[in-house]
Amino acid sequence: MKAAGERERIHLVVATSPIHRKYKLGKSREQIRNMAVKSVAMASDLCGEVQFSAEDASRTEPEFLAEIVESVIDAGAAVINIPDTVGFTMPEEYFRLISYLKSHVPNVDRVRLSVHCHDDMGMAVANSLAAIRAGVRQIEGTINGIGERAGNTALEEVIMALHSRRDFFSEVRTGIRTNELVRPSRMVAAMSGLAVPRSKAVVGANAFAHGSGIHQDGVLKNRSTYEVMDPEEIGWGATELPLTKHSGRHAVKMRLSALGLSVPDTDMPRLFELFKKRGDQCKFVYDDDLAALVDSL
């Protein structure tokens, strides 16, 4: 085989859980350990950096996981990945598992710890953040959380959690330009054919859209009342306040002003009545609808 380039990495995966050992591989603990060590040693001769993943690590006996991790580090692994392959783990459990490895693997300080989470129970982002709190410094995931079955960790959500909650993650910086997050999200959606749900955190079209009149009024007064992130920091434009039947008079007046439409105060009650009727007929009242209502007065 030809040696890899200077910036290349070989990623090796060996399943370690009892379920995989019995039903998929038909091998004992010792056979699995020997397979992993031999593979890592061979890869280390070909590449400057080897990553080892213990597939289904979250359902592997902690003591065996610690044993195999120690062995592959001695064999030359530089990155150790602890996957939650079937999205089985809860955040507290994941934190404990990473902490266990850090305290029970003598040579763990020689490597970078990584996690790879699946979202079968909606825990991929939470588990990844718990792992970071436990000391992991590599997170594997995908744009928009796409992936096998229910998907993988949504990287944009992890990035913005780290960015927005520096009180929790004071030692972690990603170096990522957060104002570029929306663009790759749209690109991935277009290329994969997998639409981003409107309600998806961070990059969903409704992530910063406020339909309730109470919410709109609060956001117009101060965005921090209902927003914990600045949409422009993510790559969105300014906060969107779509008009719906729940929108209040203040929001309607603000939109009229933005559109350059002037309505006498005496006509506002009638306009608002017409606006409410239009809102009952459709989900959103668009700018053209509002202009038509003004013309009808």
What are these regions (language model features)?
Residues 160-162, 167-297:
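A mid-to-C-terminal "edge-of-domain" accessory segment
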Residues 1-113, 129-136:
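Alpha/beta enzyme core
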Residues 16-18, 56-58, 86, 117-122, ...:
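Acidic, glycine-rich active-site loops and adjacent beta-strand->loop/helix elements
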Residues 37-41, 66-70, 95-102, 126-133, ...:
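Predominant activation on well-ordered alpha-helical scaffold segments within soluble catalytic domains
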Residues 1-3, 27-29, 61-68, 141-169:
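Active-site loop-helix segments enriched in His/Asp/Glu that coordinate
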